[in-house]
Every structure is written in structure tokens, then in C-alpha cells.
Amino acid sequence: MLLRKYDIMKPHYILLTCLLMMAFLDISAQTIPVNKRFGKVSKEELELSSYDLDTSATALVLYENKWTSVHLNAAGAFNKTTKTHTRIKVLKEEGLKWGDFEIVYYSSNNNHESFSGIDVVTYNLDGGKIVETKMPKKYIFDEDFTENYRKLTFSAQDVKVGSVIEVKFDCVDTRYWNLEDIYFQKNIPVNLMECEVRIPEFFSFNKKMSGYHSVDYAAKTESSTLQSSGDSYVYNIDIDYYSAADVPAFKKEPLVYNYRQYYSGVKYDIKSLQIPGALYEDYSVSWEDVDKNYLESDLYIRFKAACQFKDETAAIAAEATDEKKIEAVVKLVQEKVTWDESYAILPEPLGQVVKARSGSNVDMNCLAAGCLRELGFTVEPVMVKLRSTGVLQNYQPELNPFDTFILRVVTSSGDIHYLDCGSSKGYLNVLDPLMLISNARVLRPDGGSEWVDLTRLCVSGTNMYFVAGYDPKGEIIGTLTIRYRGEDAYLAKLDYASYADEDAYMEDLEEDFGVEVVEYSSTGLKDFSDNASEKISFTYSPDTSADLVYVNLFIDPFHSKDTFQSMNRSCPVDFPYPYSISYRYTLQIPEGYAVEQVPENIHITCDELKASVKMVTLADAHTLQAVFTYTQDNILGLPSDYENIRSFWQHLSDIYGSMAVLKKM
């Protein structure tokens, strides 16, 4: 089994008589006054119909309090207790979902979380009187979720627009070192949140703040007494107080893979535990510790397992090139096992995977690794933290920072290929954009692990050629040829596969382009390859006025102003990958017509994105031509650069309205 932080750290049993005194410091003044006691919901809170600081809010956190204490229980073992109290106001229909609660929690043989005191009350006004509806305990459901995890679900009763929902519960966790990240920001506004964290001086934690909204902080200490072996020891409890008022909803913006990493919050990471004369444990880790953790786990054992398909692999050895052999192995694994569309970190026993004919991406990667080693390739796991779970900081080691792993395959000639066998939409060096991170780690024994950048494994782009003619009857009849490569091919395949059939795909294409498709063909959209193409013949009617024909030079825009509607932005812009677009438009001018007007030539750059756009339009008596190119090398735009990026994007999007005018002679 893969060793995790909560399996390595064992509770330490010490005799103790401990008195804990609760206190809280009210630091911030919120816009809406609230009585913080559970059940003390005011008529004013129920009469509230909108939130002045954000009239678009569908719901509002009126008050939230989190109290966390690391302490010793009656048996002398360290535990962590967290008490949560939340009060939410429903302002619009879309906010009704805030009455549904889901808690995924840890439960294994060694360590576990346990919940108690779950109390959920809904408050409504009826004839000017406050009516309370309590949730019966029978509506609390506790079920298996995944390995070592369970899920609690429950829902407030009689929730409607105008309701106030109040919930409280306690959680005791034997993983005392694992303090939950505290977020003062959500995707709805927060009127007031208060938090208290109580930690005995024996513990040392690193604290890291995140986000852009200010959070008030204060600290103090209290004394307590530890009884051990007949001796008494007076020690301090360090108490952190946090308070945040009028916290705006975190606005979801395009081109963000993980919103939570930008929420205003605080994260606690344990460094050490020291009880003088009794115990010292250092919980800080290096990347070498992280490597060792994985190398000594079932992850690496199953990665090194023998080939499961020896006969088929022997036949693959006859392929002409190393690339063809690798490609054949991936196809073999994908024929034998269907991807269950999950990204995992720990492979299942490979025999079970083959028998089930279904598995995670790492199950399939382990099967491919065995075949590739059988063919003489050097194969190594590359540890990846998916972009959807946040950015990995390689200067700040964590024991289990990764979400999954892919394969690094080295050929006899020294060529290096990265691959993931889960998705059939990828290829060698063409991965799901979620995996395109700058800090992936090649896992090697004996201290040989290294960091690698996966953001530029292949050249990605789209080439488009549109050749058409204008029928004097009033229609443009043309053929659009599209060639995708690299990551663009991956996304094109993913898009194509999302439709039930080709007819549904055509119907959507006609709606998007505003055309009538006459003929369609494609290659590579269902293949394991790094390219794909489409050929579409269609007709459409341009706008006309008297003897003028207005020809839009773009069938469909490549970029949109809607991407960056906000005037400012507090989180980075995270593009999927570097890419380019090449588009050539050719229109044959019919006899009796002439080009009256063409757009001006354009060249715009954006230093922040290392991006450039050019458009050149040419015309003679017989042909109208436009050539458009776009290139972008940077994939990350900083908030400080957002104004320039947005301005560039606006000018870029304006290009797609470019019109040429034909005149009947």
C-alpha cells in the first residue's frame, strides 16, 4: 500500500490532565450585524432580500465559525477536534443548492475522522413570525466513497428563497498533524468568518497565507499542565485568531484550472513535535523523503511488475521503429483494458486490472511499462500534480503532493517520449492539458530523481484553408480544410468524441458556423496519433445591400472578447499550452464583380504573452485573399499584466469582424 502521511505518523500516548478554555477575539466589523450564537437568527436576517455589496449574489454566508484544537484525549493520545458553525442566507433560486451538504472524510484501520453533533435548522418567515424546521437525523447518510474515505450527506429541510440555513457539527480526527486548510473566501460572499486554532507549544507548524482579501490576525497564549509519570509540566497553548469581514465572492474567471488555490485562506503544515525529555519527531520532509515514500510503496512495486502480455509484446518487436513499437504497446494496452476515466496515484494489482478489463490511467501505464521494458526500453514513472488540483511549489516539499504518474520512455537512440495510456486522444508527447505542468518529477531510485518541464513537449497548432467562390445567386460556396497537430489535435478529438454521432457533430457545426454543410470528411479524429484533419464543404449567404456584397473573412472567430470581460483580475491567466493558428482565406471573384474594399493590414503584439497576430489582405481582379497568423509562447499571464493582456485580446477579437466588400459592376 502507498504510504501516506497519516499512515506514517502514529499517535503518541501520554498521561495528561488538561484544561482547555475557549476564547474568541472579535476583530472585524461586518456589514450585516449577526448574533453569533447558534439558533439566534434575527428577523432582519430573514427579511434580507439582497446583499448590498454584491446584488448578484445567489446566497450569502452570514456567519461562519471554525474552532480547531490539537489536544490529548482521555486515553492520552493526541487528537484534533474541529467545531464548525455556518449560517447561510438564500437570496435567489440558484442559491437553494447551499442547503445540500456533502463531507468526504478519512476512515482507515490506522486513523479516522468521526462526526457528531450534526444539527441543521432552516428558518423562514411565516406571517411575520420566525418558523424553525429542524432536519431529522434520519436524513443523514453515511456511505463508502473510495478506498479509505467515506462520505456524509444531508440536506436542510423546507429551504426556499429567503430562508436562513444554519448547520453545526463536530469532527474528531486522530491525524492531529493534519490541520485542514482554512478558507475565508467562497464562491458566494462572506459577511463574517471567524476562526480559532489552538496548538500546544510542543508542535511547530509552518503557516502560509493565500489570496488577496485582507484577514485580521491576533495571537495569544494560555497555560496548561501536562501530567506524565507522576511529574507535572506546565506548557503553553498557542492560539491563533483570524477574522474576515465583507469577503467578496471569488469570481470565477476563464482560464483558471484551480480556483481554490487563490482563495483567501491559511494553510498549516506540521514541522515537528517535541515534548522535553520524552519525545522528538521531525515531520519536515525533503524531496528525497518524498521519493523514498513512493519508491518503497506499492506504487513502485506494481510499476516494476513483469509484462502481462508477453506473446503480444513479442510480436510488436518486429515493428520497424522505436516510435512504432511504443505506439503499438499503447494500442495493445488500450485494447486489453478500458480506461475508467480516472486519474489515480496508486495502481491496483495488475492481474486484477487485466481480469476486470478496466482501470485507471496508472493501471494502464503500469501495464504498458512492463511491455516496454520487455522490448528493451528504459521506462520511468513521472509524478504529476494535475493543474486542476493546484500548482506544485517545488521549493516546498510535501509528503504526498502528486495526483498521478505518466511514463517517460527512452529509446536506444536516446530519444525521450512522455505518454499516458489512459486517454486514447493523446500520443507520444501529447498529454491531457491537465498534465502540462512545469514541475513534474521523474522518480528514480538511489537519489537520481529530477524535475522536468512538461509544458513544451510538442508543437501545437491549427492550420486552416478556406477556398470559396461567390455565386451570383447570392451564396458563397466553399471548402474548409483544417489540420490539427499536437495538443490542438488532442482537444479536437476530445470535442468530436463528446457527440453521440457524426450527425450531432454536424448539426452543432452548422449552428456555430452559420452554414449548411454539403459534405464532411475527417481523418485521425479517432486515432492514437498527434494529428487530425477535417474537410468541410458548405454554403452560406453573405449580407448584401443593393449592388454590394459584404464578405466576412472569418467563418468562425478563434478568440472572443468574452474571455476577458472583467476590468481587473486577482488571479493569473492560465492558458493550456503554447500554440499557433494559421488561416488562409481565398475567394474567387465572379465575373461582373470587383473588390470595392478590404480590411487594413494588421500586426499586433503582446509582450506579456509573447504573442503576435498578423493579418494581410490582398485582392486583384480575380481573387480576394486574406492570411491570418497567431502565435503565443507564454501560457501564464500575471494579474499585474492583466490590463495589457485584456487590451490585446480586445484588439485581437475585433479582427474577426473584418469585412471585404464586393461591388457589382
Regions of interest found by a model, annotated:
Residues 1-33:
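Bacterial Sec-dependent N-terminal signal peptides
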Residues 30-292, 348, 363-369, 373, ...:
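Beta-strand-rich, non-transmembrane domain signature
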Residues 76-77, 303, 319-326, 499, ...:
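Generic detection of long, well-ordered alpha-helical segments
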Residues 287-356:
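Secondary-structure boundary elements
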Residues 336-339, 435-440, 592-595:
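Short glycine-aromatic motifs
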Residues 506-665:
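A carboxyl-terminal module marker
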